[in-house]
Amino acid sequence: VTYLDVDENGVVKLDELKKAIRPDTILVSTMYVNNEVGAVEPVEEISRVIKAKNPSALYHVDAIQAYGKYVIRPKKQGIDLLSVSSHKIHGPKGVGFLYIRSGVKIKPLIYGGGQQAGMRSGTENVPGVAGFGAAVKEMYTDHAEKIQKLIGLKDYMTDRLGEIEGTVINSKKGEASAPQIVSVSFEGVRSEVLLHALEDKGIYVSSGSACSSNHPGISGTLKG
C-alpha cells in the first residue's frame, strides 16, 4: 500500500500520485471531501492521471461527505467505484450504497441467498432502503438553493470567527472546501471546555471526527 501526501489544503498532490502509480497498481482510493476540514479533491483530474498512467487501475471514491452536497456523475468524472452512506444526508443509519461501474468485477464479501445482485447476501433492510431513498429525494429537491444557503451560512460563520483573536480557520472558503464543514482551532482553549460552554447555549459542535473518537489527541489531519 502506498500512502500519498497532500498539500496544505488537504488535496492530493497529482505529481506524487503520478509517480506512485505502477504497472501492478490495481486500485487508487481517495475521499471526495475530507470529513474534518472539508477539502474537495479534484476527482476528475485524479481519474485522468490514473488512467493515463495505468488504464487497468480502478479508481474508488469515498463520497460519504460529498453526496447530497454535490451533483456527482461517476461515469463523466471517471469514477469506477463510489461509496455513500445514508446517515450523512439525514437518512437512517446502517444503510448505504456502492456504485460499481459497468464492467468492473467485484467479489462479494458475504455469500448465501444472492440478494443485492449477488453482492451482499442476506435479508435486505427494506425500511432502511426506503428511508435512504426518501432522504435522497428530499436532499436533491431545490438542491441549488439549499447549497447556496449553506455556503452563505459558512461564509458568515468563518468571517465572524476570524474576528476572534487566536482563532485559526482550518477550512477554506469557496469551491476548495465543502459548504457543510467548518474546522476551527482556538489557541489556548481546551476543546472539552468550549464544547460544554457552547452546549449550554444550544450550539452543538464536535472536537474531532467520529472515527477518531476513541483516540483523543491532536487530529492527524490537522497535524499534517
Which residues are covered by each model-predicted region?
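Pyridoxal 5′-phosphate
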Residues: V1-G224
